[in-house]
Amino acid sequence: MRKPFYKILYVQVLFAICVGILLGHYWPDTGVAMKPLGDGFIKLIKMIIGPIIFCTVVTGIAGMSDMKKVGRVGGKALLYFEVVSTFALLIGLGAAHLLKPGVGFNIDPATLDTKAIAQYVSKAHGQSTVEFLMHIIPDTVFSAFANGDILQILLVSLFFGAALAVLGERARIVVQLIEQVSKVFFHIVHVITKVAPIGAFGAMAFTIGKYGLGSLVPLLKLIGTFYFTAIIFVLVVLGTIARMTGFSIVRFISYIKEELLIVLGTSSSEAALPHMMEKLEKLGCSRSVVGLVVPTGYSFNLDGTNIYMTMAVIFIAQATGIELTLMQQLTILAVAMITSKGASGVTGSGFITLAATLAVVPTIPVAGMVLILGIDRFMSECRALTNIIGNGVATVVVSAWERELDRKRLASVLNGGSGDVADLADVGQGVR
């Protein structure tokens, strides 16, 4: 029996977003006061992300008889991430040159007030590649979970899962216990997801109330260019990859519409991470691949952030009248490939990453970030949506490469079969 439309989660979230926009626009002070609702929902989700990743990765790896497979899956995932991320960076660069969103501003960098971006610049300075790699190693096992650092949690999970796999039958009871605990945490996710409309309402009301729709007008060309480019990237680049793997990107997007609306409302792709992992398992991807690819992708496969970074850099250069040579643009690409790995699925991280990129490329004034500070929140939604779609496609692709994709289930679910996560426990965890 079909649910009444008003009980469907994505309908509730969409309605909440619309109400949030209206409240923020007509009663901005009240809209700003709704911020705790959005923040509270994201904190509830972040509270559960660590245990979800740990349980999923550990049970997935513990079920592998060949430990070389873990390295193989990780290697394929990183190769995919680098290739697609490079495409995203190039597309952002090309779109900015083609559509020229910054031409005509004629702004003198010396007249820009950098106080507003000081906090982002201070956060952006500091981390070298070595420091980034060292940061992945937590001070203690428990500090990884206390800090909520996804890469640190992933490292702990990899070691724990590998140890259980080596112990084999002697550790079987531990694996079974973690599997049962995993079910408990996923049930908690279902409960938290029920309040997603409230979180989306609060976050959207705050965004519109604080920044106002009027702040969009002067920079509509940049916003339109970014959204248009992201849509083209998803439909053409990710669509081609999906077609080569044997599924439709449009149907895939329809399948994860609830997660996308949650991301749209909160501007954070992390808000949908636990539910997304469930959906991908339900779609036919093996638990081991989901557990490895999705958390890693939140630092290494941020397609939307990559498009945004190169486009924003060229926009600032155009707006301030700076001509970039081919070598300077190649330098920007190289730097962006490194700095983008420091981004995460948290709201505002893309802006911090942009500051890090500009700090390494002295040709373009960091002060130019002031131009897009007011609209960054409105671009954050598109970044997060593109990121989560990209990570979903990556997981299906790597599962297919590993021959651990249940293609019959994939076709059935995307063609309108049961896509609910309630019966996820029935999905096998082994080779598909």
From Swiss-Prot:
Show the GO cellular component annotation of the record.
Answer: plasma membrane
Q: Which GO terms describe its molecular function?
A: fumarate transmembrane transporter activity; malate:proton symporter activity; succinate transmembrane transporter activity
Family membership noted in the UniProt record? Belongs to the dicarboxylate/amino acid:cation symporter (DAACS) (TC 2.A.23) family.
Membrane topology, from the record: Multi-pass membrane protein
| One Gene Ontology term from the biological process aspect of the record | L-aspartate transmembrane transport
UniProt-listed PROSITE patterns? NA_DICARBOXYL_SYMP_1, NA_DICARBOXYL_SYMP_2
Q: Where are the transmembrane segments?
A: 8-28, 44-64, 78-98, 148-168, 188-208, 222-242, 307-327, 355-375
Protein's name in the database: C4-dicarboxylate transport protein
Task performed by this protein: Responsible for the transport of dicarboxylates such as succinate, fumarate, and malate from the periplasm across the membrane.
Q: Where in the cell is it found?
A: Cell inner membrane
Which InterPro entries does this UniProt record tie to the protein? Answer: C4_dicarb_transport, Na-dicarboxylate_symporter, Na-dicarboxylate_symporter_CS, Na:dicarbo_symporter_sf
Keyword annotations for this protein, in alphabetical order, are:
Cell inner membrane, Cell membrane, Membrane, Symport, Transmembrane, Transmembrane helix, Transport
